[in-house]
UniProtKB/Swiss-Prot annotation:
The gene is nuoD. This is NADH-quinone oxidoreductase subunit D. Keywords: Cell membrane, Membrane, NAD, Quinone, Translocase, Transport. It is found in: Cell membrane. The lineage of its organism: Bacteria, Pseudomonadati, Bacteroidota, Cytophagia, Cytophagales. It catalyses: a quinone + NADH + 5 H(+)(in) = a quinol + NAD(+) + 4 H(+)(out). GO terms for cellular component: plasma membrane. NDH-1 shuttles electrons from NADH, via FMN and iron-sulfur (Fe-S) centers, to quinones in the respiratory chain. The immediate electron acceptor for the enzyme in this species is believed to be a menaquinone. Couples the redox reaction to proton translocation (for every two electrons transferred, four hydrogen ions are translocated across the cytoplasmic membrane), and thus conserves the redox energy in a proton gradient. It comes from Amoebophilus asiaticus (strain 5a2). NDH-1 is composed of 14 different subunits. Subunits NuoB, C, D, E, F, and G constitute the peripheral sector of the complex.
Length: 403
């Protein structure tokens, strides 16, 4: 009747003679494509993955599916008309991107340090609220990647409060055009500070619930601890920044190092990876650092609200557009400005012409682009299922990568 398989003590024994011995079997590597339309890639990203069985041999990211010519737009439009395009870089942190771009142009105009204090505090308040919303999206979708759906729903519920505050202040939920060169589109609506403080008070215990539900969850720890370890030297060599770099053990935060805007006046800590559940720089550390940064953003937000409701409270004669130039005209110069976005260093290099209303060249330095570049280094030797965990922990936005 041909070959039979007999079960003997846990081993299957082939009673018929075999033509090939196990040592003669050939193993071939398999190439698969993940994306560009795949929820686990967090955007329009294609990963060319070479596998030996289920072990990742190499990963090659392919970009360009979301390229929208930002730098060409920036070189052909007046400075103030470029801000709506800046919103579309990291569309999950548009306030932070606007802040960085506005600071760059203000530096060229000689306005650094001359803006009204209320304007500066409102800018930082909005930037930190947007950092919270961005980290909520990052941690929530990461939970989905690993099979934890409830945490995503809870974080999206809390993120919705922030989007409603932004909509109240700017009229938009995601792409704001609120931070203008030299000022703001509009002062905060009456009652905004009080409602924002109510939200922060509500949020504190909710974060502890997320910590118990996801961050300290045994299954989550098993899926992320000791997975995708990013050594500090590798992170520095690839230009990694933000929470991904800090998770590898380097306490580097541009808000503290550069001290831009009013951050030197604020008190906050800079969490770094400590390897509490595994190895420093693993997937769990990257998620834990982002979670701790949410707590620090709450501290900064509270300090801003205290100032905005006391010595910097609204007055009838306050005009947030007082320093906004009607037409931006710069001197011939080169300028590079950077800011600490939720995903790391966002920088803008300007080459300006004399008395020009637009730059000769505007180069955007994307944090997500540099952070994604380490995927090949840290994914090799991991199983395919862990590759998904690694991508989610890096937290990329393709709008910022492709530009």
């Amino acid at each position: 009747m041909g070959k039979h398989i007999q079960y003997q003590g846990g081993n299957f024994k082939n009673t018929a003679p075999t033509k090939y011995q196990p040592t003669d079997l050939k193993v071939e590597e398999v190439l698969i494509n993940i994306g560009p339309q795949h929820p686990a890639t967090h955007g329009i990203l294609r990963l060319e993955v070479i596998l030996d069985g289920e072990i990742v041999v190499d990963v090659v990211p392919h970009l360009g599916y979301l390229h929208r010519c930002f730098e060409k737009h920036a070189a052909t439009l007046p400075y103030n008309q470029t801000i709506p395009f800046v919103d579309r870089l990291d569309y999950l942190a548009a306030m932070n991107s606007e802040h960085a771009f506005a600071m760059g142009v203000e530096h060229m105009l000689g306005l650094t340090g001359k803006l009204p204090r209320r304007v500066e505090y409102i800018r930082v308040l909005m930037a930190e609220l947007n950092r919270l919303a961005s980290h909520f999206m990052a941690i929530g979708t990461y939970g989905i990647d690993l099979g934890a759906f409830t945490s995503f729903l809870w974080l999206m519920r809390d993120r919705e409060y922030i989007l409603r505050l932004f909509e109240w202040a700017s009229g938009a939920r995601m792409l704001y055009n609120y931070i203008w060169i030299g000022g703001l589109y509009y002062d905060l609506p009456v009652g905004f500070e009080e409602r924002c403080l109510e939200f922060i008070t509500y949020l504190k215990p909710k974060l502890e619930e997320i910590n118990q539900l996801l961050i300290d969850n045994t299954l989550f720890i098993k899926r992320t601890a000791n997975v995708g370890v990013l050594p500090l030297a590798t992170a520095i060599n690839h230009g990694v920044s933000g929470p991904i770099l800090r998770a590898s053990g380097l306490r580097l935060d541009l808000r503290r190092i550069d001290g831009y805007s009013i951050y030197p006046e604020l008190s906050f800590d800079i969490p770094i990876g400590e390897g509490l559940m595994g190895h420093v720089g693993d997937c769990w550390d990257r998620t834990w650092v982002k979670f701790q940064e949410c707590k620090e953003s709450i501290k900064i937000t509270e300090q801003c609200l205290v100032r905005l409701t006391s010595d910097l409270k609204r007055t009838a004669d306050f005009n947030p557009q007082k320093m906004v130039p009607k037409k931006v005209r710069t001197k011939a110069q080169d300028c590079y400005i950077r800011a600490e976005n939720p995903r790391g260093e966002l920088g803008f290099f300007f080459r300006a012409s004399d008395n020009g209303d637009k730059p000769i060249r505007c180069k955007a330095r994307s944090s997500s682009f540099s952070n994604l570049s380490v995927i090949s280094s840290i994914a090799k030797g991991q199983v395919l299922a862990d590759l998904i965990a690694i991508i989610g922990s890096i937290d990329i936005v393709l709008g910022e990568i492709d530009r």
